[in-house]
């Protein structure tokens, strides 16, 4: 967008959010079609020019956070209020994840922050405002070449670099190599090794959690075949994190994909903090499996999912 349009977007946003004018009134004031005014206001929001702050705590969510932390041994837990979304609660989780990332970036405690994959993390980066950062690098925690652009981590890393002004690195290799031998060849390349090691050493890893079924994003994005995920399900696989699979008891599973996966370790031996951003009733079993693995430092989820995770039927 040209500078003139940037200025116009800010003016439209100011009239709408500060002056309290309707979008049609903004359009009339600026001499624009209503559709144009709407797009300018939306652009200002997407660019992080509009920041909303709500003071105060939601008692019910805090109670859920404490109960989840106690039940699963979490050091950090955040529950976003239910806003009535159907299916995957992308708006609630996206805003909660965006606020978490903004706080972590502003605190300046990290040299490297690792970013996983998935629609929820993409939404969080999308909702995150522009943030001032210093001496910070972002790195993708998994191979970034996919056949489906919508699932491509490159876009997420580009946006987070744009919003922080800090460098963001992706691994220029597939998430899953064709063979274990191919994986070794790819990881032996100097540029790939550097980014892979950076991801493994990231002090903070923000990840998504996936299911092990036909609706899993790994399947719908074309990263793996349906038959492969069915094979993992037959082994007892329930949840997935960074291409690592877990059964209902939280035990890590060695699968046919294990030797082909190009992603950072999820072991906590390096003392990194792994924080998962995940929710939705369809993912409850997957999230519970990963929680039981003991590998998570923290969880950011939504209210209905939190209730289901502590045993309240249907998240009610």
From Swiss-Prot:
Up-regulation conditions: Induced by erythritol and negatively autoregulated.
Gene: eryD
Gene Ontology molecular-function annotations: carbohydrate binding; DNA binding
Result of knocking out the encoding gene: Mutant shows increased transcription from the ery promoter.
Organism expressing this protein natively: Brucella abortus (strain 2308)
Keyword terms, alphabetized: DNA-binding, Repressor, Transcription, Transcription regulation
Any Pfam family matching the protein: Sugar-bind
DNA-binding stretch(es), residue numbering of this chain: 23-42
PANTHER family: TRANSCRIPTIONAL REGULATOR LSRR (PTHR34294:SF1), TRANSCRIPTIONAL REGULATOR-RELATED (PTHR34294)
Protein name stated in the entry: Erythritol catabolism regulatory protein EryD
InterPro entries the UniProt entry points to: NagB/RpiA_transferase-like, SorC_transcr_regulators, Sugar-bd_dom_put, WH-like_DNA-bd_sf
Known function: Represses the expression of the eryABCD operon, which is involved in erythritol catabolism.
Family the entry assigns: Belongs to the SorC transcriptional regulatory family.
Transmembrane segments: none
UniProt note on regulation of activity: Erythritol may act as an inducer, probably by binding to EryD and inhibiting its repressor activity.
């Amino acid at each position: 967008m040209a500078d003139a349009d940037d200025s116009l977007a800010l003016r439209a946003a100011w009239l709408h959010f500060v002056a309290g004018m309707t979008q049609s009134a903004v359009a009339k004031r600026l001499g624009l079609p209503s559709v144009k005014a709407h797009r300018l206001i939306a652009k200002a929001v997407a660019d992080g020019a509009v920041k909303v702050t709500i003071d105060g705590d939601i008692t019910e969510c805090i109670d859920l956070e404490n109960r989840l932390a106690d039940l699963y041994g979490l050091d950090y837990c955040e529950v976003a209020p239910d806003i009535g979304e159907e299916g995957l609660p992308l708006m609630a989780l996206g805003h909660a994840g965006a606020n978490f990332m903004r706080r972590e970036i502003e605190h300046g405690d990290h040299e490297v922050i690792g970013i996983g994959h998935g629609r929820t993390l993409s939404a969080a980066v999308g909702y995150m405002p522009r943030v001032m950062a210093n001496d910070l690098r972002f790195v993708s925690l998994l191979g970034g070449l996919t056949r489906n652009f919508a699932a491509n981590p490159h876009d997420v890393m580009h946006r987070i670099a744009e919003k922080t002004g800090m460098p963001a690195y992706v691994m220029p290799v597939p998430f899953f190599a064709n063979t274990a031998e191919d994986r070794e060849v790819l990881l032996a390349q100097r540029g790939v090794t550097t980014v892979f090691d950076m991801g493994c050493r990231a002090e903070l890893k923000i990840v998504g959690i996936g299911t092990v079924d036909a609706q899993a994003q790994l399947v719908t994005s074309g990263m793996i075949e349906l038959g492969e995920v069915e094979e993992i399900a037959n082994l007892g696989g329930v949840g997935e994190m960074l291409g690592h699979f877990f059964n209902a008891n939280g035990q890590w599973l060695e699968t046919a994909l294990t030797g082909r996966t190009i992603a950072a370790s999820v072991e906590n031996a390096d003392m990194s903090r792994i924080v998962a951003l995940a929710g939705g009733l369809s993912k409850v079993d997957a999230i519970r499996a990963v929680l039981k693995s003991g590998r998570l430092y923290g969880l950011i989820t939504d209210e209905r999912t939190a209730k289901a995770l502590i045993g309240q039927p249907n998240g009610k």
